[in-house]
Each structure stands twice: as structure tokens, then as C-alpha cells.
């Protein structure tokens, strides 16, 4: 199977988010890459589900709280940008202050 670099990157993000969701379910605090992957996948899946850009941004900004992440991680993530595939094409989604 031949994958483009973008497809490989998406697979890595989805794989990391799967691990991160499992760790979160076990009550572990997430590190920086885990937190970013969950926010990113939430935005990408919301877009794939047919939600609007605004709804995707709102949902992705509510998926994690400061209690879900290690100390200082929330301060390291002022925003997350992801190119998501919506029903009408791909768009850049910016999630501001994703961890509150």
C-alpha cells in the first residue's frame, strides 16, 4: 500500500489519539502530544461528520480540560490548527485556547 506523507501523518495522529483516549479513560493525565492528538482528531472527525467549521471549533475546544492534562500542558497549546475535510472541501480549522 502506498500512502502519501499526509496520509501517514493522519494515521500517526489517529494512532496516538487512540492511545491518548485510552489513557484518559484510565484517569491518567495527558502529555502535550496526546492532548494535541485528541483535539486534532476531534476536529477532523467533526468535519467528517458534516458539522460546520464553527461547530467543529467549539467541540474541539471542549474535549479536554486542565484537569485532563499534566501541569503546564495547557499553557503550551495556545491554539491547534488542522486541515480538515468537510463535506464541501478541505478547510483550515484553528481551535483557540483548546484546553480550559
Curated annotation (Swiss-Prot):
List GO molecular-function terms, semicolon-separated: nickel cation binding; urease activity
Pathway recorded for this protein:
Nitrogen metabolism; urea degradation; CO(2) and NH(3) from urea (urease route): step 1/1
Q: Name one GO cellular component term.
A: cytoplasm
Provide one Gene Ontology biological process annotation.
urea catabolic process
Q: Which UniProt keywords apply?
A: Cytoplasm, Hydrolase
User: Which domain of life does the protein's organism represent?
Assistant: Bacteria
Where in or outside the cell it occurs: the entry states: Cytoplasm
Instruction: Please state what class of enzyme this protein is.
Output: hydrolase
> Whom does it interact with, and what assembly results?
Heterotrimer of UreA (gamma), UreB (beta) and UreC (alpha) subunits. Three heterotrimers associate to form the active enzyme.
Q: Which NCBIfam families match?
A: PRK13241.1, urease_gam
Question: What family classification does the UniProt entry report for this protein?
Answer: Belongs to the urease gamma subunit family.
Instruction: State the protein's name.
Output: Urease subunit gamma
Annotated organism of origin = Yersinia pestis
Amino acid at each position: 500500500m502506498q500512502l502519501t506523507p499526509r496520509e501517514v501523518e493522519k494515521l500517526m495522529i489517529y494512532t496516538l489519539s487512540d492511545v491518548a483516549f485510552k489513557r484518559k479513560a484510565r484517569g491518567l493525565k495527558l502529555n502535550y502530544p496526546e492532548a494535541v492528538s485528541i483535539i486534532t482528531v476531534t476536529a477532523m472527525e467533526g468535519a467528517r461528520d458534516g458539522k460546520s467549521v464553527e461547530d467543529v471549533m467549539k467541540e474541539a475546544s471542549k474535549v479536554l480540560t486542565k484537569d485532563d492534562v499534566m501541569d503546564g500542558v495547557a499553557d503550551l497549546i495556545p491554539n491547534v490548527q488542522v486541515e480538515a475535510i468537510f463535506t464541501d472541501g478541505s478547510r483550515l480549522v484553528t481551535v483557540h485556547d483548546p484546553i480550559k
